[in-house]
Amino acid sequence: MKVTAVLMVAVLVLTACQLTTANTTDYVRRIPARKSTMSRRECSESGEWCGLDPALCCGSSCFFTCN
């Protein structure tokens, strides 16, 4: 009986998490101005921090700093 109750609570929590996530992505999709500012990025010059994401650099190579 207790196991059933725990499983039911777990399913309800997971369902609530999925609904919250779906609602957030729908909110971003409905606001074009917010979506465009999130997708638009300036590129970093040589020597600036980029982590390991080459999309942040104006060039194509990135290893913690733009090359």
Curated annotation (Swiss-Prot):
| GO function terms (MF aspect) | ion channel inhibitor activity; toxin activity
Question: What InterPro entries does its record include?
Answer: Conotoxin
What keyword terms does UniProt attach to this protein? Cleavage on pair of basic residues, Disulfide bond, Knottin, Neurotoxin, Secreted, Signal, Toxin
Q: Which cysteines are joined by disulfide bonds?
A: 43-58, 50-62, 57-66
Q: In which tissues is it expressed?
A: Expressed by the venom duct.
Specify the domain of life of the species encoding this protein: Eukaryota
Q: Which residues form the signal peptide?
A: 1-24
Enumerate the Pfam families for this protein.
Answer: Conotoxin
Q: Where in the cell is it found?
A: Secreted
Which positions are cleaved off as the propeptide during maturation? Answer: 25-39
Q: What is known of its domains?
A: The presence of a 'disulfide through disulfide knot' structurally defines this protein as a knottin.
Designated name of the protein: Conotoxin Cl6.7
* Protein species of origin: Californiconus californicus
